[in-house]
Structure formats: structure tokens, C-alpha cells
Amino acid sequence: MSSSSSSSRCCAAGVFLVPSLLLLPLLLSLIHTAHGATLREHRLSGTEPVSYGPPSQLRPPPSAEMLRALRYIQSLSERTPADPDQSDQDAEDDMESVRSVLKMASPTRREEKDNTQELLQAVLTTLQQTEEHMKTPQKVIAAPRYHQFARPKQQVKVDTDDGNYGRNSWAENRRRYREYPIMFEDDQPLKRTNENAEEQYTPQKLATLQSVFEELSGIASSKTNTKRSDDDEDDEDLYRQRKMVLEDIMGTDDWTPLEEQMESEEEERERHGFTRNLEDDDEDDDGKRSLQSDWLQTQREEEEPEDMAKLVDYYLLQMLEKKEQEQQKRQEEDEEEEVEKKDEEEENVEEREVKPMQSLSEILKISQKLRIPPEELLQLLRNENRKDLPGRTGYAHKTFPSAPHRRPIETSDIAQDILSILELASAAQQNQRPTQARNERYYERQTSRDDYDDTAGEEDELANYLATEMQRHTRMAPLRDEDQPVNLQNYYEKPPAEHENAATGIDNSTMMKILRLLDPESDDADETDSDAGEKVPEM
């Protein structure tokens, strides 16, 4: 029994020891962390306000400017009319707003207890201390070199009034001009005062004051809005409650008097009758519109052919008028062209006309100036006139038979007969060269759309050929009188027949033969050939 009891005790002790052994590492870790997280005093940063630090780090009490700010706040609160019923609620709201501001400004103290009452008591004590300090004279520790000018009492009273808060009288408080100029930058009189002001008015203090003022103004404006909304909601709630009670008592049926019910029924009947009349009027209007549309369609169908005929006539008249106008314009243009041509011809004739007296006088003047006899001047003028004649210049149709890319002109029998008549048989024989292979891409026939005559091309070729032969003959001929010196005696000694032949060059008979060859189908040509019985002379 003793052995069994001892074994059971050992088992029970082991059962209790196992969980304690498991909890040992947790305890050790907690002890280690507790030793590591040693508690120490909170030190403020450069931007954190002094009021949130421990009492050992508190700065000296606020100055007169802080008192003026607090008095200004109290004056603002007094200006707003406060209701006696809701004064307690306003105080509670102000306390809640101050607490919320403190909580927002101090995020590190969210886990700590709410010490708002202690903070308020501290603020009140500081205010009392400042008042006592203001009443009792204090020794001001001045800088070793610089001494502040004492302001008069009137100016101090004006500055410390509640109404003058926020108004800076910097222009009036300027220091007097010194007799001697400043020698160094350290001698500036306002440097030390600026340092003191920076210590008293930090940007955080100013920001907190500004936020307090903004919240106070927002609270004053929100109170009025909330009051109105609350009153409206209360009225609506009362109306709903009364309505619910009446419905529970009287039921959902209408409990209006009989007269009102009768009036409402009559109004409904009148409305129904009015709507029925409107529907009937709409149906009548639809019927009338359908009838009008049918009547208009029939009229249009009847008027369509008449309209088409009128349109056709109208367009025809317009076309005729346009044609007449075009014809008139063409006639006017033709008349203008004819008038211009006549004017040009008259001008040319006037220019060509030579007045004998004026021409002789001009020739004599020129001969006197140039010291040339008048006979030589007349001879020179005659030679120039002969050169300017249109028959002598053959630039109208230029041909280049010697070019390699042109084919030679094939002379027909009629052309040979004409050349023999004109004493050009030798030139025709020289031109008859062996024909080359025709290259069609250089000799494509180009005719206009209106040219349907096949013989026009042949006639043009023949005319060109004759013109070239005439030019060649003139080149091969001996020099004329214009190139050789003129012998007036030989010229006048010649008989008149030679002069006529030189002037005409071709007899009338030869011209008639040329015309017959050009028109072989005419009967008159055959008759004249039979009557004459003459042969063409061959050279």
C-alpha cells in the first residue's frame, strides 16, 4: 500500500510540474522585455508645445499677450446671446470640443486617463499667477548692452484693452532714430526683442489659438442650425404621434364632415366629365384631320399633271432664253472682233501709206546727217523692202528631208507634171531617192474629230512639197539684183517683154495647165485641151 501511494503521489506531482515547466520560457521572455523597456522621462521635441511636458520642464508663465487673447475669447463668448435653458448644454459642448482638441493635439496620451480637469485647474492657476506678477513689480533681466525704452502708461492701457486685440500698432511703436549710425550688425536694437518674441509666440501656440478661434466660430454658427433642425424634427414627430393616435382611435376611414365629402365627390364628377369631353374633342379632331388629309391627297393627285406640264414649259422657256442670250453674246463678240480687225487694218494701212513730201524731206535730212547721197539711200530702202516680202521668206512650213528619222516624200504623177511645167524636172529627179522602210510610230496620223476628209492630208503634203521645191530652186538660182550691184542703164535698155516676164515669172497658159492637172475630172479642162492642142513643154 505504501508503495502504491508513493507512486500515485509522484504521478500527481509530475502532472502538476509539466505545465509549469512549459510556462517558464514565457516568464523569462516577459522579464527580459520588462528589463529592456525601462521607464524614463518624456523629453519634448523642438516643435512640441511645453504644456504637454512634465512639470519639471514647464516654461515660465504666459505674458500679457496671452491674457489679452483669453479676454478676447471671453468677450466673444459674452457677445453671443446665450439662452438660459441651454446654457448647461453649451458648457458641456464647449468642454467636449476642448477635450477633442486636446486629444487631437496629444496623440501620445490617448491611452492615459482623462486629466482634463487637472489641466483646466493648472490653466487657472497660471492665470492667477500671471495676474499677481502683473500687480507686483518684477525685475526684468535686461541685456548687457541694450536697454528697452519705457512706454508711456497711456500706450500700455490702449494696447491691453480687449477691443484692441489683433491690431498691431507697429508704425507708432517704432524706436527713435539714433544720433550715430550703426557700425555692426550686432548693434541692431530689435534683434534681442525678436528673440524674446520668438520664445513667447511659437508657431505651435499661434496654430492652437487659431484652431480654438475657428472652433468657437463654428460652434456658434452650428448651434443656430442645430436648433432650427431640432425644432422642425420635434414638430414633425409630434404631428406623426398625434396622427397615429387618431388612426388607432378612429380607424383609417375618413372622419371629415359630410359637407366636405359631398364637395369632394362633386369635384371628382366634374373632373371625369371634363376628361370625357376632352377625349371626345380629340376624337373629332382626329376625324377631321383624316378627312383633310384625304382631301389634300386627292387635290395633289389632280394637280400633279398640271404642275408637271407647267414645270416643263417653264424649263423650256428658260432654255430658250439662255440660248437667245448666248446667241446675242456671240453676235456681240463677233461684231467686236470685226470692229477690232477693221481698226487694225486701218492702222496698218495708215502706217503703210507713204506721204511723198514727208518721205522725201526725211530722206534728204538723213542723207545730210550721214553725208550719204540720196540715191544710195533709196537703193538701200528698196533692197530692204524686197527682203521683207512674204513670198521670199518660207518659214511657214519647214521640212528637213535629210533627217534620218523622216521618210522621203513620194511624188505623184500630178506633182511631176506640175514640176515639169514649172521647169523643176531636174530637182524632182534629184529628190527621187530609194524609199526607206516606214516606221509607223514616227508617222502616226493626227487628225481632229471634225476632219472626215481623207484627201486633206494628201493636199497638205503636196503643198508642203511644192513649197520646199520652190525654196530649193530659189537657193540654187544665181544671185539676184539685191545681191549684185545694180546697173540702171542695162535695166532700162532691156525690152518691156523681159520686164513683164521677170515680174510675172509664169504665163497664163502654164497656170491654166496646173489648174487642169489639179482638177482632172472637170469637162472644161478636156475641152480646152482639145481646142488648144498644145503640149506641155519639157525641159
UniProtKB/Swiss-Prot annotation:
Signal peptide residues on this chain, from the entry's feature table: 1-36
Similarity section: Belongs to the chromogranin/secretogranin protein family.
Listed GO CC annotations: extracellular region; secretory granule
Gene: Scg2a
Superkingdom classification of source: Eukaryota
Known function: Neuroendocrine protein of the granin family that regulates the biogenesis of secretory granules. Required for normal courting behavior and spawning.
Main localization of the protein described in the UniProt heading: secreted
Protein name, UniProt field: Secretogranin-2a
Subcellular location: Secreted
InterPro entries, per database record: Granin (IPR001990), ScgII (IPR038858)
Residue ranges, compositional bias (Basic and acidic residues): 438-450
